[in-house]
Design a protein with these regions (language model features):
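Rossmann-like AdoMet
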Residues: 1-21
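SAM cofactor-binding core of SAM-dependent methyltransferases
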Residues: 14-113
Length: 113
């Protein structure tokens, strides 16, 4: 019988952190408490992975890098959402996203650079 070269030789207890879409990832559960620093690149408007990681490791330091998310982005994103919300009574979620961003990144040891 041939040996299956794709079979796993050990078991890893994986956990999904973040959303079920692009913002979430599978990682070994055992490394969460061992991690001191989390570097995140390409944050966008979904920091659910970082938020979930921080919830499981309160001492974690997080540095996020994304050149597309800046003051101008939030200004335009929020103003446009407010305008369309007033006009059409929708896009309220975009406004809430801004406030969630401010709340998460105002925590100690959490930076968006």
């Amino acid at each position: 019988m041939k040996k299956n070269i794709f079979s796993t030789q050990y078991k890893v207890n994986l956990i999904r952190l973040g959303n079920n879409y692009d913002g979430g990832y599978l990682i070994p559960k055992s490394i969460i408490k061992k991690t001191n620093l989390l570097l995140s690149f390409g944050l966008g408007t979904d920091w659910s992975f970082e938020k979930s990681f921080k919830k499981m490791n309160r001492n974690l330091k997080i540095n996020c890098y994304d050149h597309t998310i800046n003051r101008k982005f939030w200004y335009e994103h929020t103003l446009i959402s407010i305008f369309f919300y007033i006009k059409n009574f929708k896009n309220f979620n975009n406004i809430l996203t801004f406030f969630k961003y401010k709340k998460f990144f105002s925590q100690k040891n959490v930076k968006h650079i």
